[in-house]
Amino acid sequence: MLYEEAKWIGAELLKISKPGIRMLNIGSSSHEFRANSQPYINEFIFRPLTENNITVLHTDIVDEKGVDIVGDLTDEIFIEKLKQEKYEVIICSNLLEHMINRGPIISAIKEILATNGFALITVPYNYPYHLDPIDTMFRPTINEIHKKFHEFKLKKGEIVIGKSFRKNKFQKNYWQQINQNPKLILKLLLRCLVPFYKPKVWFYTIISMKNIFKPFSATCILVKK
């Protein structure tokens, strides 16, 4: 998650929140990731919510510390379990680009979200190819991601320019991420010369290199059911 993206998410969630509501953060990752690897996630999003008596439950397919509900959002039984809890807000941040089949996850969000509830969705807009464990290079515009939730009303949409955070340093673009690693630069340049080996990965690498000096950004939308 980008630094400014976390600020945007936190600010929008506070605007629509009131004490007593329940939020579900899907694809949440661990407490270690939210509090230490990218500490601004906790600082700008979850700490203010906690201070305002907002309940946030974190769900992920991986059982780690900080994951409240472990389960697979493509599993109908698991979805039915979540639907019974009546979540007024669902957060889905930087998950959809890692799904080969996004349909079941999007359908799950629509099913689980309470009537008149809000879904806050973010995905990268300009960010290089990164495996976690895969990256489909899904980099939609505001309209493209809203079309996935066309039954919902778009309350706000923005392309948020921001900085990434890796190895305790901020980076504004891909060049700043790789310029201290000559071996990686050489590897990327050589990869660009071999289009016939794993052509899809080659294409994604070309896109990443093409945008090497462009600022990182994320597509962020808030929709209402």
Where are these regions (language model features)?
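S-adenosyl-L-methionine-dependent methyltransferase catalytic module, highlighting the catalytic core
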Residues: 100-111, 118-224
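Conserved SAM-binding loop
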Residues: 21-131, 143-146, 221-223
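Hydrophobic, Leu/Ile/Phe/Ala-enriched alpha-helical segments that form helix-helix packing faces
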Residues: 12-14, 49, 149
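Extended interaction regions within the primary functional domain
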Residues: 8-12, 26, 212-214
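Short, surface-exposed alpha-helical recognition segments that flank or form part
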Residues: 1, 97, 211
